[in-house]
């Protein structure tokens, strides 16, 4: 026999679940910052919230998935920023302005983003292959959503037009390239958003360089609003 649940009761249950989920995320990042990602166990995260490991796994499949909650919020905000860019902007310029503005918001703590948590994620991506791998996997899974928004901006059907797919792929590549450049010390800046801005600038300028041609790196820009 099916059972029903009164709206107020269901509402309380959902709020309790949300509070537990947020408490697990807060505890996880606190431990990640104190001990490091690899040294932190699921059991320790659960103990911080006074729940069992089994309860943790009701909300997250792994420690890596906790990290992805922040990236999911960041990605959603970037899609919204991309959709709101002026229609007159070329696709790569719109992608650049949307991505860089959201990254700077994460770094500066605006729009509700936690800059310390963002910095913690950057450190974990550098030190943990598991976190870096899951981040790349997350980006690949979200590429279809970027493609859809780009196609809507262009007024084309992505089923028959490959340009939205190429632009979305370049966007993902820009994030990966920026991280690799920053990690290797190629760039003199310590801000991820500035390196990402430069990478998008290179993409906008084109990559058909002659072997002996020396061209300056694009300057960092401030996205227009």
Feature locations, PLM:
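Hydrophobic alpha-helical connector segments
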Residues: 69, 76-121
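Basic, helix-initiating cap at the start of DNA-binding domains
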Residues: 1-35, 39-51, 194
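Hydrophobic/aromatic-rich alpha-helical bundle segments in the mid-to-C-terminal region
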Residues: 156-200, 214
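HTH DNA-binding helix-turn interface
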Residues: 11, 35-37, 50, 57-67, ...
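N-terminal intrinsically disordered/low-complexity leader segments
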Residues: 1-16, 160, 201, 207-225
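Amphipathic alpha-helical packing segments from all-alpha helical-bundle domains
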Residues: 129-154, 165-166
